[in-house]
Amino acid sequence: MPHFSRPFAREVGLLAAAMKESVIAKAMPRKRTLIPSPLAWSPTAVPVAPPLLPVVAERGGTQLRTPLPVAIIDTREQNPLSFRRFRKWFADIEERALSLGDYSVRGMEDSCVVERKDLADLIQSFTTNRNVFINRLRRMSECPHSLLVVTASLSDIKSAYPYRAANPNRITQSLIAVLAGLRVPFICTETHELGEEIVASYLYQTFLYDWLDRNGHGRHLSDGDL
């Protein structure tokens, strides 16, 4: 019987164990995932049409009859989100001056505040008008429902600007500071149209949750869910 050195025998044993595990792994059926890996998704993104309503509330499987909010657009907003595509989400759409923010809901002007910025306005707000903007954000942080919406992608915000006075890193990190320091959430949308849908849905849902809470239904859309 041939004699092998201990190191060689150990390597042979490890190789045999690895081959055994490989055979077992191949014999076991693989579980199919319901959602494929994001790497397999198409890189071409085409947003689908918005829903008839963002969400509905139900209790015991029966949809509740809930009122629609009245959206408010600040009259000083430049290139405003008109919400024309989402008129069925609101009882009415008003244009009048707001003391804070660009968008709100009637009856919740002091508790629901949405500030919108396109890329150029965001850069100017974090540079030339930084003190004014930070003070506005501090006031927003005191509101129960506040949201900063940027109608530009994070890639655009992080990319080089045509003017050297503004630093993409400083703008990006200022956004993170707004979230971490002031606890004001922000969301970036690639287009003006997507921003319009996000803001419209936020106003609708903020009003709906508030109505459910005030009328003894609790802050959830359906039993055991959001």
PLM features: what roles do these ranges have?
Residues 9-10, 15-19:
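Residue-level detector of structural "landmarks"
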Residues 23-110, 121-226:
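Non-catalytic C-terminal interaction segments of nucleic acid-processing enzymes
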Residues 112-118:
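Conserved catalytic cores of phosphodiester-cleaving nucleases, focusing on short active-site segments
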